[in-house]
């Protein structure tokens, strides 16, 4: 049973502790949500209310104490007066006279509550309005014995106490009755306290609490009045000003206030309306300017990127998107370094940081930096990047950086090919010139010691080298002529004659290399629209190219046949619905797929990759240019180590 009660007590204490904790947490949360201004106001109000309540309490308490002191003095005087009058009567032991005097004195003084007279032995001699037995029950004799034991009666000094044993507060005064240092008795008189003192303590508390509550009520009412009449419109105005400052010009205040506050609200709404119209005009103007800028940037051949001072992308054109493979990505507002290739970031990011640092730490000046970036990892590309700072010219503050990206990959490759071409041509020209000079000098210096067969052999070699030199020079001249704007007259041409002439020209060369050179021409092949000499040059270059890359015992076939024209242009004269296709095929070393895309570039030689054959690298470029002059394209099908097949189509000349 005892254990069960202890368990109940512990459960109750635990529940009470949980409840108190929850209340405290709610109070802490509520207090944390209160603003600092409200906290300060509450603390100030609390301090003022406590101060005013304390002052009120102190003032009323002082008045109460002063009143009590006056009552005590009155009681002392009254008791001394009574003691002086009853001492002779008590000395004469005249009980009846004592009774009459005390009764008369009691009845004539309304403030007296009771009168007790003790004899020298401490026994009640007379009492009013209580009987002796009742008085003994209400009052103890300790005070009287104190007088007797400590001889206080010699001083005739009254003892004043407050007696609460009766209903109401009574000032209890004890005075020794003595004459000539002889104790005759003791007078105990009870005087009713001032009625105001009875209620003054409660009044003091009530007034202090009322002052405290009144101050809080005044503050609360003042705050409520202030909130509804002043604070609310001011708060609305403050919110409106903040929204206006943040760019929300649609903010309006709709409060029914008159006077100066109403005029202020009206002027605020009018200002917001004007700002809204001004913003709309600016937005339209900015939109128009932005559209113009975007149109201008999009038409620039180079890549263009505009960054803000935090390196976030503001504007990027199509060329830059294609250069960096950003198709389908929305990079506007993103940091540029998150989207650039790693190679570019490593070279570009330090420079961008340096530009921003210098413009923040030093006086901002407009500057342009140029860097060349080469990509080597996934694909080889070369970019020329121009970085130009964009400044606010009024305050010389950095606003952003403009990046111009030029793809110089093709130029670099052409430059490399050109350098290779110069190296090849210089080598190819130097070799025949050296051979020609060597053999001519030998003939000149040793012609007497050489027989006719040796002289003829030297002259034949010199003649061969001269032809080789002539071909090199002609290749360069032909390419320059073909790349110019010179117009060539296209007329009906006998393609069969051109093919047969080419075969006759290179039949001996093919025989020397043990290569079979065949032709396969469709019977009754129609004439084509072209330039006979240029067609001869096409066939010669392609046949020479095949001879160069075909192993001994190989085969070269030159075909010509009619094919349907899938892109017939019936409105153009000299055209019909068919074309003649020319093919030059071999079973030589073939061309890799990678090189097939580059084989028609100027100065590029397939021997750059095999390092066994000679040439300038202009033959196929010349072929491509000639075929383009004939409004056609050259195509290539090749497999490495299996051979190659070049083919192109020529338009059939219309019969007049």
From Swiss-Prot:
PANTHER family in the record: SENSOR HISTIDINE KINASE GLRK, TWO-COMPONENT HISTIDINE KINASE
Descriptive protein name: Uncharacterized sensor-like histidine kinase ycf26
Encoding gene (name): ycf26
Domain PAS stretches: 289-359
Boundaries of every Histidine kinase domain copy: 424-654
Subcellular location as annotated: Plastid, Chloroplast membrane
Pfam families assigned to the protein according to its UniProt record, in alphabetical order: HAMP, HATPase_c, HisKA, PAS
Bilayer topology term: Multi-pass membrane protein
Catalytic activity: ATP + protein L-histidine = ADP + protein N-phospho-L-histidine
EC number annotated for this UniProt entry: 2.7.13.3
Modification type Phosphohistidine: residues: 427
MF term (GO), any: protein kinase activator activity
Domain HAMP: start-end pairs: 231-280
Cellular component terms (Gene Ontology): chloroplast membrane
Keywords of the record: ATP-binding, Chloroplast, Kinase, Membrane, Nucleotide-binding, Phosphoprotein, Plastid, Transferase, Transmembrane, Transmembrane helix, Two-component regulatory system
PROSITE patterns for this protein: HAMP, HIS_KIN, PAS
Transmembrane segments annotated in the record for this chain: 7-27, 40-60, 210-230
InterPro entries: HAMP_dom, HATPase_C_sf, His_kinase_dom, HisK_dim/P_dom, HisK_dim/P_sf, Light-responsive_reg, PAS, PAS-like_dom_sf
Broad class of enzyme this protein falls into: transferase
GO biological process, alphabetically ordered: osmosensory signaling via phosphorelay pathway; regulation of DNA-templated transcription
């Amino acid at each position: 049973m005892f254990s069960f009660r202890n368990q109940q007590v512990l459960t109750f204490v635990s529940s009470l502790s949980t409840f108190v904790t929850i209340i405290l947490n709610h109070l802490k949360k509520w207090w944390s949500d209160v603003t600092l201004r409200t906290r300060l106001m509450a603390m100030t109000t609390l301090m003022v209310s406590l101060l005013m309540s304390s002052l009120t309490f102190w003032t009323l308490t002082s008045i109460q104490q002063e009143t009590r002191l006056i009552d005590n003095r009155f009681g002392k005087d009254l008791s001394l007066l009574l003691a002086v009058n009853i001492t002779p009567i008590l000395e004469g032991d005249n009980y009846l006279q004592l009774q009459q005097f005390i009764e008369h004195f009691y009845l004539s003084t309304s403030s007296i509550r009771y009168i007790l007279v003790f004899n020298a032995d401490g026994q009640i001699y007379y009492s009013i309005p209580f009987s002796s037995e009742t008085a003994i029950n209400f009052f103890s004799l300790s005070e009287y014995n104190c007088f007797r034991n400590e001889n206080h009666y010699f001083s005739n000094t009254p003892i004043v106490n407050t007696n609460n044993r009766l209903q109401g507060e009574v000032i209890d005064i004890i005075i020794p009755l003595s004459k000539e240092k002889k104790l005759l008795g003791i007078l105990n008189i009870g005087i009713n306290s001032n009625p105001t003192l009875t209620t003054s303590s409660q009044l003091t508390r009530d007034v202090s609490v009322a002052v405290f509550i009144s101050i809080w009520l005044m503050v609360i009412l003042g705050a409520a009045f202030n909130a509804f009449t002043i604070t609310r419109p001011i708060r609305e105005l403050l919110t409106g000003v903040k929204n206006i400052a943040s760019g929300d010009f649609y903010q309006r205040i709709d409060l029914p206030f008159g006077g100066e506050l109403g005029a202020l609200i009206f002027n605020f709404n009018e200002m917001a309306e004007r700002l809204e119209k001004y913003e709309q005009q600016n937005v339209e103007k900015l939109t128009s300017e932005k559209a113009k800028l975007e149109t201008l940037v999009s038409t620039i051949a180079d890549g263009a990127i505009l960054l803000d001072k935090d390196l976030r992308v503001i504007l990027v054109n199509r060329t830059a998107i294609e250069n960096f493979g950003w198709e389908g990505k929305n990079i506007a507002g993103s940091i540029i370094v998150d989207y650039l290739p790693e190679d570019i970031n490593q070279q570009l990011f330090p420079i961008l940081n340096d530009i921003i640092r210098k413009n923040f730490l030093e006086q901002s000046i407009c500057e342009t930096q140029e860097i060349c970036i080469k990509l080597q990892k996934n694909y080889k590309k070369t970019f020329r990047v121009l970085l130009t700072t964009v400044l606010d010219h009024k305050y010389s503050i950095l606003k952003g950086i403009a990046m111009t990206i030029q793809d110089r990959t093709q130029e670099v490759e052409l430059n490399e090919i050109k350098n290779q071409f110069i190296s090849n041509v210089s080598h190819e020209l130097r070799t025949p010139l050296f051979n020609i000079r060597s053999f001519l000098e030998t003939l000149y210096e040793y012609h007497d010691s050489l027989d006719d067969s040796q002289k003829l052999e030297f002259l034949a070699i010199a003649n061969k080298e001269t032809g080789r030199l002539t071909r090199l020079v002609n290749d360069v001249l032909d390419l320059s002529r073909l790349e110019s704007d010179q117009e060539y007259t296209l007329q009906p041409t006998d393609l069969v004659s051109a093919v047969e002439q080419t075969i006759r020209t290179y039949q001996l060369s093919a025989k020397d290399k043990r290569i079979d050179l065949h032709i396969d021409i469709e019977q009754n092949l129609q004439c084509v629209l072209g330039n006979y000499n240029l067609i001869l040059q096409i066939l010669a270059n392609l046949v020479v190219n095949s001879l160069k890359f075909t192993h001994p015992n190989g085969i070269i076939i030159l075909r010509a046949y009619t094919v349907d024209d899938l892109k017939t242009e019936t409105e153009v004269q000299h055209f019909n619905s068919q074309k003649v296709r020319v093919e030059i095929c071999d079973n030589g070393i073939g061309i890799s797929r990678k090189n097939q895309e580059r084989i028609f570039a100027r100065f590029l030689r397939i021997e750059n990759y095999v390092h066994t054959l000679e040439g300038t690298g202009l033959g196929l470029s010349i072929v491509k240019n000639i075929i383009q002059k004939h409004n056609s394209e050259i195509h290539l099908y090749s497999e490495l180590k299996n051979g190659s097949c070049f083919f192109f189509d020529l338009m059939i000349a219309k019969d007049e």
